[in-house]
Structure formats: C-alpha cells, structure tokens
C-alpha cells in the first residue's frame, strides 16, 4: 500500500486544502477527518480490512471535532509489527488575514 506518485500526493493535498475546515464553519475540521476516512476506505487494503479504519469524535470538545486513524498489520512471518496512521488535524481562523484570507 503506497501512494503511486507525486501527482497523487499533489491531488490529495489540493483536495484537502479545498475543504472548508475552519471550525466555525458547519462541520469544520470534521469534514477533513471524513475525507481522510473515505480516502483510506477506498484503498484496496482497507476494503479487505475495514475494521482497521476508525473515525472518532474527540471527547470533551465543545467544537465536536473528529479524527481518523487506521492501522496496517505486517504480513511477514509472525513479526506482529503494525503501522499506525494517525495525524493531527487543526485549522485556524482566517479573519486576521484581511484581504488575503481567500
């Protein structure tokens, strides 16, 4: 399981930054977490192992943010190695940027 090219990474980046994700917007950062979840679920590995992808709501968070994580279990021998895919999603308001905020 790997990204196939620079172009795919570029496409993913462009799609993610195009998502309105400021927390005061409807759904805020959750929309990005959902995008990541859907992306993972579209990969062949996770189609075969959908239980290894989760989207969860952050506890005690008045903005009701979400995060996504996934994990890939190793297949060589009985090493038991696992790769965990998780990242921090955070956005900030753009009001301070005035005319260049868009």
What do the PLM-derived regions correspond to, one by one?
Residues 2-102:
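Acidic/His- and Gly-rich active-site-bordering loop/insert found
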């Amino acid at each position: 399981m790997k990204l196939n090219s620079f172009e795919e990474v570029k496409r993913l980046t462009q799609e993610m930054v195009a998502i309105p994700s400021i927390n005061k917007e409807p759904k805020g950062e959750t929309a990005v977490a959902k995008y990541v979840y859907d992306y993972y679920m579209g990969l062949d590995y996770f189609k075969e192992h959908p239980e290894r992808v989760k989207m969860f709501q952050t506890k005690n968070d008045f903005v009701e943010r979400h995060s996504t994580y996934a994990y890939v279990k190793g297949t060589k021998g009985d090493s038991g190695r696992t790769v965990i895919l998780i990242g921090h999603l955070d956005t900030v308001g753009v009001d301070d940027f005035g005319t260049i905020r868009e």
